[in-house]
């Protein structure tokens, strides 16, 4: 059999002569992610991070050039929403040092997950440990999915959506085009054309509770 991820792919292979009877739509296996923690573990993680009711924005898998965009947005939004915190998770460990410098330049109090720093006295935590990002989505308010304001093509938004969290991204998401096409039909995901638009999209998720609750509900559709 010929198994394709999207209906568009099925059409394309049929157009170039693939036999109809063996060409099947399989769907995207990346839709099959499941949450790995129960509500007790999620509460425990929030306590471990000492979030104390703060709303944490998770900036996930950021690439070169994106950290500045996120830090700038956070700086603007922090003036309006004093209860927000930022978890910044660079995609590549070799960039940790550079990203730490960028964070330090903002003047915000910050810590590092590798030092077991918490949000108790910090506005920003850099996630510089491996294998923890997935569970961090469970305690975020919403997530920015990186690789989408660089030429990388984005990362998987479902990793945040499965926890019921909406996502914001830049428009460069060709790696997950079909997933984003599906998610952006509702408010589960929003693609922003510019850093300014991204800041506004983030602002709406913080300022408009009805919109935020709808966006959260849309993630499970």
Regions found by a protein language model. Name each.
Residues 1-221:
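Nucleotide-activated sugar donor-binding and catalytic core shared by glycosyltransferases
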């Amino acid at each position: 059999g010929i198994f394709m991820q999207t209906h568009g792919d099925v059409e394309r292979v049929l157009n170039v002569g693939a036999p109809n009877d063996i060409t099947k739509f399989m769907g995207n296996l990346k839709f099959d992610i499941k949450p790995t923690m129960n509500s007790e573990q999620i509460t425990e993680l929030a306590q471990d991070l000492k979030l104390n009711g703060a709303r944490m924005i998770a900036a996930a898998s950021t690439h070169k050039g994106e950290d500045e965009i996120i830090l700038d947005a956070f700086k603007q939004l922090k003036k309006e929403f004093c209860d927000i915190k930022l978890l910044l998770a660079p995609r590549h460990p070799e960039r940790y040092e550079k990203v730490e410098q960028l964070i330090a330049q903002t003047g915000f109090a910050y810590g590092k997950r590798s030092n077991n720093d918490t949000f108790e006295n910090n506005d920003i935590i850099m996630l510089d440990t491996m294998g923890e990002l997935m569970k961090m989505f469970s305690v975020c308010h919403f997530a920015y999915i990186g690789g989408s304001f660089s030429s990388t093509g984005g990362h998987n938004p479902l990793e945040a959506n499965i926890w019921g969290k909406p996502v914001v991204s830049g428009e460069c998401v060709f790696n997950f085009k079909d997933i984003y096409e599906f998610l952006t039909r509702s408010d589960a995901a929003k693609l922003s054309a510019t850093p300014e638009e991204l800041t506004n999209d983030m602002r709406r998720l913080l300022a408009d509770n009805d919109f935020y609750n709808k966006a959260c509900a849309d993630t499970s559709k």
